[in-house]
Amino acid sequence: NESIRYFTDILDTKVFTHIFFSICRILNREKKGFSEDSISEELQKLVTKDYSSNISKATCNRAISWLYFSGIIGFCAKITEMDILDFKSASRCYFMDMGLANYYLTRTGTDSRVLAGTLNENYVYINLKKRQDFPPEISFETPAFATYRGGEIDFLAQSLSSSTRYLIEVKAGKGTASTAQKALAQGKADKLLYLKGATKGGIDGKTETLPIYLLEQYKFN
Protein backbone atom coordinates (compact mmCIF):
# COMPACT_ATOMS: atom_id res chain seq x y z
CA ASN A 1 0.00 0.00 0.00
CA GLU A 2 1.63 3.22 -1.21
CA SER A 3 0.14 5.33 1.60
CA ILE A 4 1.69 3.19 4.35
CA ARG A 5 5.13 4.64 3.56
CA TYR A 6 3.92 8.01 4.81
CA PHE A 7 2.54 6.73 8.13
CA THR A 8 4.24 4.84 10.95
CA ASP A 9 1.34 3.50 13.02
CA ILE A 10 -1.71 1.35 12.26
CA LEU A 11 -3.90 4.12 13.72
CA ASP A 12 -2.37 6.46 11.16
CA THR A 13 -3.42 4.31 8.20
CA LYS A 14 -6.94 3.75 9.57
CA VAL A 15 -7.46 7.51 9.64
CA PHE A 16 -8.22 7.42 5.90
CA THR A 17 -11.42 5.45 6.43
CA HIS A 18 -12.39 7.64 9.38
CA ILE A 19 -11.90 10.76 7.25
CA PHE A 20 -14.05 9.35 4.44
CA PHE A 21 -16.93 8.66 6.83
CA SER A 22 -16.55 12.11 8.40
CA ILE A 23 -16.64 13.80 4.99
CA CYS A 24 -19.91 11.96 4.26
CA ARG A 25 -21.50 13.14 7.49
CA ILE A 26 -20.44 16.72 6.83
CA LEU A 27 -21.87 16.63 3.30
CA ASN A 28 -25.16 15.17 4.50
CA ARG A 29 -25.94 17.82 7.07
CA GLU A 30 -27.27 21.29 6.42
CA LYS A 31 -24.40 23.69 6.93
CA LYS A 32 -22.69 26.93 5.96
CA GLY A 33 -19.22 25.42 5.91
CA PHE A 34 -17.20 24.11 8.80
CA SER A 35 -17.65 25.30 12.36
CA GLU A 36 -13.88 25.16 12.82
CA ASP A 37 -11.35 27.40 11.05
CA SER A 38 -10.14 24.77 8.59
CA ILE A 39 -10.99 21.46 6.97
CA SER A 40 -8.26 19.74 8.97
CA GLU A 41 -9.59 20.99 12.30
CA GLU A 42 -13.19 20.07 11.51
CA LEU A 43 -12.29 16.58 10.32
CA GLN A 44 -9.91 16.01 13.22
CA LYS A 45 -12.68 16.99 15.64
CA LEU A 46 -15.07 14.47 14.06
CA VAL A 47 -12.48 11.70 13.74
CA THR A 48 -11.32 11.95 17.36
CA LYS A 49 -14.89 12.25 18.66
CA ASP A 50 -16.37 9.38 16.66
CA TYR A 51 -13.43 6.99 16.33
CA SER A 52 -10.26 7.50 18.33
CA SER A 53 -8.91 10.28 20.52
CA ASN A 54 -5.42 8.84 19.95
CA ILE A 55 -5.24 10.20 16.40
CA SER A 56 -3.09 13.32 16.44
CA LYS A 57 -3.70 16.55 14.58
CA ALA A 58 -0.46 16.03 12.64
CA THR A 59 -1.60 12.59 11.49
CA CYS A 60 -4.97 13.95 10.40
CA ASN A 61 -3.32 16.82 8.53
CA ARG A 62 -0.93 14.45 6.74
CA ALA A 63 -3.78 12.16 5.72
CA ILE A 64 -5.91 15.03 4.40
CA SER A 65 -2.96 16.47 2.46
CA TRP A 66 -2.19 13.04 0.98
CA LEU A 67 -5.81 12.55 -0.09
CA TYR A 68 -5.93 16.02 -1.64
CA PHE A 69 -2.66 15.85 -3.55
CA SER A 70 -3.51 12.31 -4.70
CA GLY A 71 -6.70 13.66 -6.29
CA ILE A 72 -9.02 11.64 -4.04
CA ILE A 73 -10.73 14.61 -2.37
CA GLY A 74 -11.15 18.21 -3.47
CA PHE A 75 -11.70 21.45 -1.56
CA CYS A 76 -14.56 23.89 -2.02
CA ALA A 77 -14.42 27.58 -1.09
CA LYS A 78 -16.95 29.68 0.78
CA ILE A 79 -18.03 33.13 -0.44
CA THR A 80 -19.70 34.97 2.41
CA GLU A 81 -22.75 37.12 1.66
CA MET A 82 -22.10 36.87 -2.09
CA ASP A 83 -18.98 39.01 -1.66
CA ILE A 84 -16.21 37.48 -3.80
CA LEU A 85 -13.63 39.43 -1.79
CA ASP A 86 -14.70 37.42 1.27
CA PHE A 87 -13.36 34.16 -0.14
CA LYS A 88 -12.30 31.32 2.16
CA SER A 89 -10.56 28.76 -0.01
CA ALA A 90 -11.08 25.54 1.96
CA SER A 91 -14.46 25.44 3.68
CA ARG A 92 -15.78 22.10 2.46
CA CYS A 93 -14.52 19.00 0.71
CA TYR A 94 -15.93 16.55 -1.79
CA PHE A 95 -14.89 13.23 -3.26
CA MET A 96 -13.21 13.37 -6.68
CA ASP A 97 -14.60 9.94 -7.60
CA MET A 98 -18.35 9.26 -7.74
CA GLY A 99 -17.93 5.54 -7.02
CA LEU A 100 -16.02 6.30 -3.83
CA ALA A 101 -18.62 8.89 -2.82
CA ASN A 102 -21.49 6.46 -3.35
CA TYR A 103 -19.71 3.66 -1.47
CA TYR A 104 -18.98 5.64 1.69
CA LEU A 105 -22.24 7.61 1.68
CA THR A 106 -24.13 4.31 1.49
CA ARG A 107 -22.04 2.84 4.30
CA THR A 108 -22.93 5.75 6.58
CA GLY A 109 -26.59 4.73 6.28
CA THR A 110 -27.62 7.69 4.15
CA ASP A 111 -31.26 7.34 3.08
CA SER A 112 -32.05 7.26 -0.64
CA ARG A 113 -33.42 10.82 -0.88
CA VAL A 114 -30.43 12.41 0.83
CA LEU A 115 -28.05 10.09 -1.03
CA ALA A 116 -29.37 11.23 -4.42
CA GLY A 117 -29.06 14.89 -3.48
CA THR A 118 -25.54 14.59 -2.07
CA LEU A 119 -24.29 12.56 -5.04
CA ASN A 120 -25.76 15.09 -7.46
CA GLU A 121 -24.01 17.90 -5.61
CA ASN A 122 -20.73 15.98 -5.60
CA TYR A 123 -21.07 15.39 -9.36
CA VAL A 124 -21.57 19.11 -10.00
CA TYR A 125 -18.51 19.91 -7.86
CA ILE A 126 -16.35 17.59 -9.98
CA ASN A 127 -17.71 19.14 -13.18
CA LEU A 128 -16.96 22.68 -11.99
CA LYS A 129 -13.48 21.65 -10.86
CA LYS A 130 -12.71 20.36 -14.37
CA ARG A 131 -13.81 23.70 -15.82
CA GLN A 132 -11.06 25.41 -13.80
CA ASP A 133 -8.34 23.24 -15.33
CA PHE A 134 -6.48 24.37 -18.44
CA PRO A 135 -7.96 25.93 -20.49
CA PRO A 136 -10.11 27.45 -17.71
CA GLU A 137 -13.75 28.34 -18.38
CA ILE A 138 -14.79 29.74 -14.98
CA SER A 139 -13.19 31.93 -12.32
CA PHE A 140 -11.81 31.18 -8.83
CA GLU A 141 -9.11 28.72 -7.82
CA THR A 142 -11.60 26.14 -6.56
CA PRO A 143 -15.38 25.69 -6.93
CA ALA A 144 -17.23 27.75 -4.34
CA PHE A 145 -20.55 27.84 -2.51
CA ALA A 146 -22.03 31.07 -1.15
CA THR A 147 -24.03 32.34 1.79
CA TYR A 148 -26.57 35.14 1.59
CA ARG A 149 -28.99 36.61 4.12
CA GLY A 150 -28.94 33.58 6.40
CA GLY A 151 -29.20 31.00 3.61
CA GLU A 152 -26.87 29.03 1.36
CA ILE A 153 -26.41 28.69 -2.39
CA ASP A 154 -24.96 25.39 -3.60
CA PHE A 155 -22.39 26.88 -5.97
CA LEU A 156 -21.36 30.23 -7.42
CA ALA A 157 -19.57 30.32 -10.77
CA GLN A 158 -18.40 33.17 -12.97
CA SER A 159 -17.62 32.98 -16.68
CA LEU A 160 -14.08 33.98 -17.62
CA SER A 161 -15.15 35.09 -21.10
CA SER A 162 -18.05 37.37 -20.12
CA SER A 163 -17.90 37.76 -16.29
CA THR A 164 -21.49 36.48 -16.17
CA ARG A 165 -22.15 35.30 -12.63
CA TYR A 166 -24.17 32.12 -12.13
CA LEU A 167 -25.98 30.89 -9.04
CA ILE A 168 -26.14 27.10 -9.24
CA GLU A 169 -28.67 25.05 -7.31
CA VAL A 170 -28.61 21.25 -7.38
CA LYS A 171 -31.96 19.60 -6.71
CA ALA A 172 -32.73 15.87 -6.70
CA GLY A 173 -36.49 16.50 -6.68
CA LYS A 174 -38.81 19.43 -7.32
CA GLY A 175 -37.43 21.72 -4.62
CA THR A 176 -36.85 25.44 -5.10
CA ALA A 177 -34.04 27.62 -3.84
CA SER A 178 -35.33 30.68 -2.01
CA THR A 179 -31.88 32.03 -1.11
CA ALA A 180 -30.67 31.89 -4.71
CA GLN A 181 -33.91 33.45 -5.95
CA LYS A 182 -33.51 36.28 -3.45
CA ALA A 183 -29.89 36.89 -4.46
CA LEU A 184 -30.85 36.93 -8.16
CA ALA A 185 -33.73 39.35 -7.56
CA GLN A 186 -31.42 41.70 -5.66
CA GLY A 187 -28.86 41.80 -8.45
CA LYS A 188 -26.14 39.71 -6.81
CA ALA A 189 -25.82 37.49 -9.90
CA ASP A 190 -26.80 37.45 -13.56
CA LYS A 191 -28.34 33.99 -13.88
CA LEU A 192 -29.77 31.17 -11.78
CA LEU A 193 -29.09 27.65 -13.03
CA TYR A 194 -31.19 24.82 -11.62
CA LEU A 195 -29.72 21.34 -12.11
CA LYS A 196 -32.38 18.69 -11.52
CA GLY A 197 -32.68 14.96 -11.93
CA ALA A 198 -36.29 14.86 -13.15
CA THR A 199 -36.93 17.76 -15.52
CA LYS A 200 -37.23 18.53 -19.22
CA GLY A 201 -35.51 21.86 -18.66
CA GLY A 202 -36.48 25.34 -19.74
CA ILE A 203 -35.73 29.06 -19.47
CA ASP A 204 -37.78 31.63 -17.55
CA GLY A 205 -36.16 35.05 -17.70
CA LYS A 206 -32.82 34.85 -15.89
CA THR A 207 -33.58 31.38 -14.53
CA GLU A 208 -32.59 28.28 -16.48
CA THR A 209 -33.48 24.70 -15.56
CA LEU A 210 -31.33 21.91 -16.94
CA PRO A 211 -31.39 18.12 -16.54
CA ILE A 212 -28.28 17.36 -14.54
CA TYR A 213 -27.08 14.80 -17.08
CA LEU A 214 -26.70 17.64 -19.64
CA LEU A 215 -24.28 19.61 -17.48
CA GLU A 216 -21.28 18.22 -19.38
CA GLN A 217 -22.55 19.97 -22.54
CA TYR A 218 -23.42 23.26 -20.83
CA LYS A 219 -21.25 26.32 -21.47
CA PHE A 220 -20.77 29.12 -18.95
CA ASN A 221 -20.66 31.91 -21.55
Label for each model-derived stretch:
Residues 1-153, 157-159:
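Accessory nucleic acid-recognition modules appended to NTPase machines
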Residues 90-91, 163, 190, 205:
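Sequence-level motif detector for i,i+2 pairs with an aromatic at +2
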Residues 110, 161-163, 174-175:
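Short, surface-exposed beta-strand-loop junctions and turns on beta-sheet-rich folds
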Residues 171-220:
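Catalytic cores of nucleic-acid endonucleases
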